[in-house]
Curated annotation (Swiss-Prot):
Gene Ontology MF: a single term: sequence-specific DNA binding
GO biological process, one term: sorocarp development
Name of this protein: GATA zinc finger domain-containing protein 2
Record keywords: Metal-binding, Zinc, Zinc-finger
PROSITE patterns to which the protein is assigned, alphabetical: GATA_ZN_FINGER_1, GATA_ZN_FINGER_2
Record's compositionally biased regions (Polar residues): 57-74
Source species: Dictyostelium discoideum
Positions of the UniProt region annotated as Disordered: 21-85
Keyword Zinc-finger: yes
Zinc fingers (GATA-type), renumbered ranges: 88-115
Gene3D superfamilies named in the record: Erythroid Transcription Factor GATA-1, subunit A
Length: 131
């Protein structure tokens, strides 16, 4: 059974539909398509191959950040790095959905989301003691 190109999923749609339309355009005067055109119209391996260069999922950057390096944020040359830190200061994690900043011994450090929330909770409790 041949599927209609209009009902194909988004990840199979454009390449196979384009190949099918070029195969019908390349028919001869008597209405018969050559065997190579028919074979190229039914070949969908390039559209489903996960390592294909046209696959948007395979070519997505894992971090999603396209930075060429440190820039200044307008405060007289202070460097602003738009990439996340390499490690959490507390637990050593390298991946986190959100990076937070905390202070230890007067020094600003990078924390993963979980450690950052814990740091905020402890800071609130310690400041309530001194009130």
């Amino acid at each position: 059974m041949v599927k209609n190109s209009e009902h194909l999923p988004w990840y199979l749609g454009s390449d196979s539909a384009t190949a099918a339309s070029t195969a019908t355009d390349a028919t001869s005067a008597d209405g018969a398509a050559s065997e190579t055109d028919a074979a190229s119209a039914t070949d969908t391996t390039s559209a489903t191959d996960p390592t294909s260069a046209t696959d948007p999922i395979a070519t997505t950057n894992t971090t999603g950040i396209t930075s060429s390096g440190p820039t200044t944020n307008g405060r007289r040359g202070r460097p602003y790095i738009s990439t996340p830190p390499n490690r959490c200061y507390d637990c050593g994690r390298t991946r986190s959905p959100y990076w937070r900043k905390g202070t230890y011994n007067g020094q600003v450090v990078h924390l993963c989301n979980a450690c950052g929330l814990n740091h905020i909770k402890i800071a609130k409790k310690s400041s309530a003691i001194f009130l």
